[in-house]
Amino acid sequence: MHRIAAFLYGIVCYAIFFATFLYAIGFIGNVIVPTSIDGIPTLPFGQALLIDLALLAVFAVQHSVMARPGFKTLWTKIVPEHVERSTYVLFSSLALILLFWQWQPLGGAIWQINNTLGRNVLYGLCAFGWLLVLASTFLINHFDLFGLRQVWLYLRGRDYEHPHFVTPSLYKLVRHPLYVGFIFAFWATPDMTATHLVFAVMTTVYILLAIQFEERDLIHYHGDAYRNYKRQVPMLIPRLLSRKNSVQQAAAVNDSV
């Protein structure tokens, strides 16, 4: 693939991702976008539930399988290595677009907060979650995570190197602040419907499973540095009572890399 074409492809894939990310905020929050998680049910409950579970499964399988090193080894025999990450980002975006398009509301209220202060607090926590997701990507390497660094290096004729293992700020408190952000974004709502609950439960289960695969790959890439980090820093819930020690331990791991 021509270097300029590869670079433009990476930019297009990133633009599709970012538009999808913004749509996801509206979809989960039931604001602005034409289709959202809590529309008016049009199908019987059982049929709608099966469709929603299938859509979530499509995303989970795509997102996890395409991220595994074994799949990448086979995939890069077809797709050039420098656009592999951009292609992964594109496929993930398409899986989410399919979910947004075909999602079937279930109806039914689990909880509803009518107090203005309570609603605003939950909206604030949801917004905090989305900001935490985005901030967490920039703390490590946003542009590598979404394929832009790879196509930029290819455009410049430079070899790609996997990013070094670092534990900046939030990563000294928990190993996966990005996933913490998603959990806040998915669960913090003043109007929890059956539809939203299914989405929140299933995505949380997926996050807990995905972490196991992701950390196995991180150990493969970073070896003892990540093993030590995993022993010393909690996965999702910070040790608030021993925050100082956790920060010092993570800093020690970072210095040893």
Give residue spans per PLM region:
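Alpha-helical transmembrane segments of multi-pass membrane proteins
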Residues: 14-34
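Hydrophobic transmembrane alpha-helices
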Residues: 19, 23-26, 46, 55, ...
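Alpha-helical transmembrane segments
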Residues: 43-57, 118-137
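Juxtamembrane/interfacial segments flanking transmembrane helices
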Residues: 65-73, 103-111, 137-153, 214
